[in-house]
Amino acid sequence: MEEEDARVPTLEPFRVEQEEEEYLLRQVFNAPKPKWTQLSGRKLQNWGGLPHPRGMVPERLPPWLQRYVDKVSDLRLFGGLPANHVLVNQYLPGEGIMPHEDGPLYYPTVSTISLGSHTMLDLYEPRQPEDDDPVEQPADHQPAPQPRPPPRPTTSLLLEPRSLLVLRGTAYTRLLHGIAAARVDELHATSLPPNAAACPSARPGACLVRGTRVSLTIRRVPRVLRAGLLLGK
């Protein structure tokens, strides 16, 4: 197995202090209303530009975000190049996001700072072709087939407030990731998350109640339109 393929999700030695967390949350919630986009199960802000297959039109990041983009870039997660895009997500208790992949518009590494509350990030194997096979219709007087159960995550990571998670290698390019729409996460002694040793709250039998969580997803968009192209030069 190649080194890149062996990489797994990690919690980097990067920590946001409580005062910094409070400052960042104030900046997020003080953003102009037009900056917010409401989706099913979350709302978000886009900073740095809107990624597009033909190239992202770059926008200057505000100083309060640029400081943390620089700190993450100093970890050299993006091939030695700086991050240039931040997606801010807000999740209320009971909200989540379906399993998905971030796709080819980004450098194959994603870093996420969690603020305000913990969550559980679920990782899934990609769907197989047989998962999409149509269900056969039952013959007359035969019981209807049972619906296929929803996919089960292969593992789940505890993301504590003020931590930085990094997904790269096959964890980014192959696995899907999502957040279950839950209000409480129960940690059982027999199934603690694999990163439990790095999480003070990951105690056997713990019942972690979710609050409002804000995530700063910091990435690099490789394809950026130059100013000359925008002006038609």
Predicted segments — roles?
Residues M1-K233:
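Non-heme Fe(II) oxygenase metal-center motifs and adjacent flexible, charged/small-residue loops
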